[in-house]
Regions:
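Residues within the alpha-helical elements of helix-turn-helix
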Residues: 56, 94, 111
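Basic, amphipathic "hinge/linker" alpha-helix immediately C-terminal to the N-terminal HTH DNA-binding motif
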Residues: 83-101
Length: 148
């Protein structure tokens, strides 16, 4: 692990309260979490139910109902005739971006010696605050140095 990579993580693990840009539009961290969880559930099970989103995120069903209403109104999700949640293209793009960040940051933190559960939790926090430019640089650095 190079010193440069370690410096990135020391810097970004302390970043909080900065403005985030995802796909050149602002979106709240909670919305990113919901979209990412929906993508993960779709990959795991082939479908996404509100109750499963609640279980995955550790939130109440009414919280999921409120969030899905807002996400639907914003054009990120819809519901199929069976009531399953379907990610629309804008929501899928955000979910994939967050999930990619989460996986890469988790792997890098583990390579730095962070315990796996802590690495996952920290990656979840970092993924939301990292600019596109900074994440692209970290990803490029990791690939060039075969750190992931």
């Amino acid at each position: 692990m190079t010193n440069l990579c370690l410096c990135f993580f020391l810097l970004f693990s302390r970043v909080s309260g900065i403005f985030r840009t995802v796909m050149k539009m602002n979106i709240h961290k909670s919305a990113e979490d919901y979209l990412e969880a929906m993508l993960m559930l779709k990959e795991e099970r082939g479908y996404v139910r509100s109750i499963d989103v609640a279980d995955k995120l550790g939130v109440t069903k009414p919280s999921v109902s409120y969030a899905t209403k807002r996400l639907r109104e914003s054009g990120y999700i819809t519901f199929d005739p069976a009531g399953m949640i379907v990610l629309l293209e804008p929501g899928l793009e955000i979910a994939e971006r967050m999930y990619e960040r989460h996986k890469l940051l988790t792997r890098l933190l583990i390579r730095l010696g962070v315990e796996a559960e802590t690495a996952r939790e920290d990656a979840c926090r970092i993924e939301h605050d990292l600019s596109v430019e900074s994440f692209d640089a970290i990803r490029r650095h990791a690939r060039e140095h075969r750190e992931v």
